[in-house]
Amino acid sequence: MSTISRQQYADLFGPTTGDKIRLGDTSLFVSIEKDLRTYGDEAVYGGGKTLRDGMGMDNELTSIGGAPDLLITNVTIIDAVLGVIKADVGIKDGRICGIGKAGNPSTMPGVTPSLAVGPATDAISGEHLILTAGGIDAHVHMISPQQAEAALSNGITTLFGGGLGPTDGTNGTTITSGTWNLEMMMRSFDALPINVGLLGKGNSSGMKPIVEQIEAGAAGLKVHEDWGSTVGAIRTSLEAADEYDVQVAIHTDTLNEGGFVENTIAAFDGRTIHTYHTEGAGGGHAPDIIRVASYSNVLPSSTNPTLPFGINSQAELFDMTMVCHNLNPKVATDVAFAESRVRPETIAAENVLHDMGVISIISSDSQAMGRVGESWARSIQTADAMKQGRGKLPEDNADDDNFRVLRYVAKITINPAIAQGISHLVGSVEVGKFADLVLWEPAFFGAKPKFVIKGGMIAWSLMGDPNASLPTPQPVIYRPMYGAFASALHKTCITFASQAGVANGIAERYGLQRLVEPVRNTRAITKNDMVRNAHTPHIEVNPETFAVMVDGVHATVAPIRSVSLGQLYFFS
């Protein structure tokens, strides 16, 4: 048997078990935990390589016979469910069909049956790439359709939220109010190459206005303080959600007019709810909304403008709040409202609670204090900042950061998918799931993806001058690919809706051409279902200093002065 050095092997086939990969310019390193391929029989595309007729490709295998449509070879997978592994990944009919060893079973041992390669199979060389699930942003103000382009450019493939363009209501709240608006927004998203789920308005003490939105296809409900986050509205929306199996997201009452955090928690009555702005900087009971993160029925999230906590966070947030919530800087009470939300102490605690796995989800709050194209970047930046500010996590090995990285990856992939009832289709790199996948060069991990695959087709990609002699000449920018056009888009993108809406035939009634899939299993889940982010410690907030105590320990970290994945990667 011939042998080669580990360095030569990595040059040819990429890293393998025990090898480490640095993520971008961060201090984070991941180590490959296991390799599912067979050494010496790697499936490699190209001139003189193994995926040729009669070698690594079975010349008798047809598409009908099971050959994958697309194979990603020798790729490093970073996935909150699978861990950090090396494998070939196959896609067929828009779904992940296999993860393991690809090739020709007639000439290669150990080929995974669903990864037998035939003439019908195309290939992406993943030897020096990282594969993740597409990101899921569960807090989107749908202010402009161009958000889809910005989101895809940072590896986000699913948007959950609401709105109907740049209305003041949309600028302030993630809600698509009413049946006609829901229909029109679903019709509009039919042409955008990204998955979507729309949230109806839950701000009603009466049941009928809520029910009609769910039956019109709302994939969830949103209760927002700008429309009145009253105890009555909370209770009614949760009752409707329990009946129809949709999730409720809430932005609580900053001014404590309708009650304090204790009253809101009592209104939850142990029922599952997704709390937006759990840290409070984006809104919610001042100063102690962060306490809800200690309850098992609460699925807590926070948004990317306060992640990671930096020296400019406080100044930036004040102006954001004034603009987004229709406040007047000439009115003293409006200024006081904004100032009550921007508390460096609770922002610092938010970062620590993310690192501890107490806050489970990271989202954007797009164009309404947050940036839809930065959730992956902010997640990895925060992981890096916390490593530098807090040191190694006890769960991590001495020479890698696998647990910490996977904890943060979970916050923007599988956990929002579980919270919104779509994890049976998206959110992880698992066989049978919709092939929403992102490929990254390690040097650009979290900042700039190389390819974004939607439903098995490349929909978004870095691409050079289309008139050039190669794909690589400048200007290399993000461009829509074939998966983002015409009816291919309809077969590779999903509109998520309530089960009641799907049963009511909204696809036909609204003339939707995209896939329409129901959300499910949103009511029986708890914090314990949040992958790698299920911690429920006791949390207290000092009402005078705003210091946050977690199991009696002050949860704080100094604001960072410089950030990874920053100006080295982006002009500013």
From Swiss-Prot:
Q: GO cellular-component terms in the record? A: cytoplasm
Q: What is its main location?
A: cytoplasm
Compartments, as annotated in UniProt: Cytoplasm
The record's remark on the cofactor is: Binds 2 nickel ions per subunit.
Recall the GO molecular function terms of this protein's record. nickel cation binding; urease activity
Question: What are the record keywords, sorted?
Answer: Cytoplasm, Hydrolase, Metal-binding, Nickel
Q: Can you tell me which residues bind Ni(2+) 2?
A: 222, 251, 277
Which residues are reported to carry the modification N6-carboxylysine?
Answer: 222
Catalytic reactions on record: urea + 2 H2O + H(+) = hydrogencarbonate + 2 NH4(+)
Q: Where is the active site?
A: 325 (proton donor)
This entry's Enzyme Commission designation comes to: 3.5.1.5
Task: Cite the annotated pathway.
Answer: Nitrogen metabolism; urea degradation; CO(2) and NH(3) from urea (urease route): step 1/1
Looking at its record, which EC class is this enzyme? Answer: hydrolase
Note the superkingdom of the native organism.
Answer: Bacteria
Q: Which Pfam families did the record assign?
A: Amidohydro_1, Urease_alpha
Q: Which InterPro entries match?
A: Amidohydro-rel, Metal-dep_hydrolase_composite, Metal_Hydrolase, Urease_alpha_N_dom, Urease_alpha_subunit, Urease_AS, Urease_asu, Urease_asu_c
Binding positions (Ni(2+) 1): 139, 141, 222, 365
Essential cofactor(s): Ni cation
Q: Which residues form the Urease domain?
A: 134-572
PTMs? Carboxylation allows a single lysine to coordinate two nickel ions.
- Can you tell me which residues bind substrate? 224
| GO process annotations (BP) | urea catabolic process
Q: Which regions form coiled coils?
A: none
**Family per record:** Belongs to the metallo-dependent hydrolases superfamily. Urease alpha subunit family.
The protein's assembly and partners: Heterotrimer of UreA (gamma), UreB (beta) and UreC (alpha) subunits. Three heterotrimers associate to form the active enzyme.
Entry protein name: Urease subunit alpha
